[in-house]
């Protein structure tokens, strides 16, 4: 694939992600009910939102992987880096595979660090890459951590996608040699417990469930196919909420992404065991539709509302939130029982 073809594909992904963005997502958060406390017995001043992670993050949300690899997406990354710095949140790069193949594309990713010089940045490579490529991706961004993304469904549907999914040896090798923490993530199809246990056996400690319900790469890649012949996979995978249930009790540090649309979605994900919650589509949508300044104001208010919701629930930190009363829908409870998953 030529540089122009690679760049065009990256631009297509951004265009289609926005085209198919849904303001009401289907990630399962509507099936989770947090119960109102008439006597919260707390104050907003007492709330500590700092996540229970060894990353020194100040907030339980972060900007998750999106883009890079073309002049247009490089400009988006510059804005995203600037936004992360202004909000004081971590940010993950889009897949750096194209820049590892073509050094001329490195600036479209490195602009993240240029605009967020002191922030926490996660580099990003696919699980098909070896340890040397992972090290190069980290160096490219002077990254604080590395995401390894799992995207089998996307690759299957992508006309020019990979067809080799022998990934576990690569993941194990990257973990063994990495100088930074590793987060293994799905890109929109979620996890089942068996695969999470396999990752644990490889030495993985941090997992982003990347559940179904948000940016849908099955739909995006199918739209790029001339025959649109994979439409039946648009609902493939486990939702973000189902994936969090699959992860409960394993001892992994879970991050939750996929279909997060509101501060309440964030709090629900945290209550289900996520240590932090990432957003991609919502951030991209606001940047494209409203511009940088309005997006910054929106997410500043978003962070403030997280504090308000904690106080409303009568909790002051993540540990206390784990005891907040919660009810699952009948369908979600049936899923939990059918899969033999721990209770909440």
Swiss-Prot record:
Instruction: Kindly indicate whether the keyword Isomerase belongs to this entry.
Output: yes
Positions that bind FMN: 65-67, 95, 124, 185, 215, 259-261, 280-281
Cellular compartments annotated:
Cytoplasm
Identify the residues that bind Mg(2+). Answer: 155
Q: Which reaction does it catalyse?
A: isopentenyl diphosphate = dimethylallyl diphosphate
What this protein needs as a cofactor is:
FMN; NADPH; Mg(2+)
User: Is Cytoplasm given among the entry's keywords?
Assistant: yes
EC number(s) recorded for this UniProt protein: 5.3.3.2
Similarity comment: family membership: Belongs to the IPP isomerase type 2 family.
Protein's name in the database: Isopentenyl-diphosphate delta-isomerase
Which gene specifies this protein's sequence?
Answer: fni
């Amino acid at each position: 694939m030529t540089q122009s073809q690679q760049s065009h594909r990256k631009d297509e992904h951004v265009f289609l992600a926005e085209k198919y963005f849904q303001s009401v997502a289907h990630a399962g958060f509507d099936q989770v009910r947090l119960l109102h406390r008439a006597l919260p017995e707390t104050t907003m001043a007492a709330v500590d939102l700092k996540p229970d992670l060894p990353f020194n993050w100040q907030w339980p949300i972060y900007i998750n992987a999106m883009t890079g690899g073309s002049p247009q997406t490089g400009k988006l990354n510059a804005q995203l880096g600037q936004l992360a710095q202004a909000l004081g949140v971590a940010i993950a790069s889009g897949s750096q595979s194209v820049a590892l193949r073509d050094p001329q594309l490195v600036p479209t990713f490195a602009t993240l660090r240029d605009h967020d010089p002191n922030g926490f940045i996660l580099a990003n490579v696919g699980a098909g890459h070896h340890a040397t490529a992972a090290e190069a991706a980290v160096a490219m961004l002077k990254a604080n951590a590395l995401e390894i993304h799992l995207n089998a469904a996307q690759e299957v549907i992508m006309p020019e996608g990979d067809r080799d999914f022998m990934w576990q040896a690569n993941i194990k090798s990257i973990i063994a040699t990495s100088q930074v923490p590793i987060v293994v993530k799905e890109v929109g199809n979620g996890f089942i417990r068996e695969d999470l246990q396999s990752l644990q056996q490889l030495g993985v400690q941090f997992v982003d469930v990347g559940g179904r319900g948000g940016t849908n790469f099955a739909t995006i890649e199918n739209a790029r196919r001339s025959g649109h012949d994979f439409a039946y996979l648009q609902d493939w995978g486990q939702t973000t909420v189902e994936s969090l249930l699959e992860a409960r009790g394993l001892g992994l540090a879970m991050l939750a992404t996929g279909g997060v649309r509101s501060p309440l979605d964030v709090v629900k994900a945290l209550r289900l065991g996520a240590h932090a919650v990432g957003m991609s589509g919502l951030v991209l949508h606001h940047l494209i539709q409203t511009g940088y300044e309005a997006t910054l104001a929106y997410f500043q208010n978003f962070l403030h509302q997280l504090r308000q919701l904690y106080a409303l629930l009568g909790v002051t930190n993540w540990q206390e939130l784990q005891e907040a009363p919660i009810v699952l829908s009948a369908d979600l409870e049936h899923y939990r029982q059918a899969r033999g998953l721990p209770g909440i």
